[in-house]
Amino acid sequence: MRAAAVSPLEHQAKVRRRKLLNGGAKTAGMRSADLSIVSLHNVLMKSLIYRLFAVATAALLLIDVGSAAESVDILVEKGKAFERKFQAKDALPLYLSAEKAEPKNPELLVRIARQYRYLMTDASDNHEKLRLGYIALDYSKRAAACGPKDCDAQLAPAITLGKMLPYLPTKEQVAASPRIKESVDKALAIDPRSDNAWHILGRWNRVLAEVSSAKRFVAGLIYGQLPKGSIEEAEQDMKKAIAINPHRLMHYIELGRIYAQMGRKEEARQFINKGLAMPDTEKDDPETKQRGRETLAKL
């Protein structure tokens, strides 16, 4: 059978439909391609924004860390300025603020302990002295724990306990003695040229050498064994302190007190008077001079 004849109008209509179909397919393809490009653009933009955000965040963190470090340095320097003038009430708040940022900084903890000892010296009430002393001791222990290779940090507990001794009950005095020796030994193992450590060791030996056998026996029965000290070793310890740092009056006065305990009165007067003639340069110098005068009065 022959196909039915197609009129010119029908033929034109079919041609238009084919064009429309072909055009629609092309348009759909173009739209699909456009959508793919848009999607890729969005992904790239999101990735770029994320990276920019990450870089900006890191930069801000670095700025914050740098600012914090700078802030701590500024606080400590301001604190040192007050400390040089023995103004503990002004130095302490600055150091405590710095501690919030660096709670494990041994040098800072040593400085804080020192300010509490300064306040302890200024306090008129023994109860208040002990309260401040225990705070200083806590910071001293923390300094020692955070600075195992720091001489000043290891020595801090010994200095604080020595400052507290006159106000402690007898039982605690006995318990403190081996702790002081342990602290000094650790400090000297780190720095054998620490005049502070030799001074404290000399005082430790002098005080314990003064305890009679009878008192030592009774103390051992009631409070526990008391370490033994040597007055001869005390003399050598203090001479080492002077040789290392001859500019501190406390070394001379303490050596004079050692000689007084040994019965060597002329040498006692010589060294105590030498210390008394030197200018006050440290917070405890007036207190040290007073002890020297009391010793002279008994000679």
Predicted features, each with a name:
Residues 43-54:
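Bacterial N-terminal signal peptides that target proteins for export
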Residues 53-64:
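Bacterial N-terminal signal peptides
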Residues 66-102, 106-121:
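N-terminal leader/linker segments that initiate helical-solenoid repeat arrays
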Residues 82-90, 114-149, 156-193, 203-241, ...:
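Short coil/linker segments at helix-helix boundaries
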Residues 249-287:
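C-terminal/domain-terminus segments
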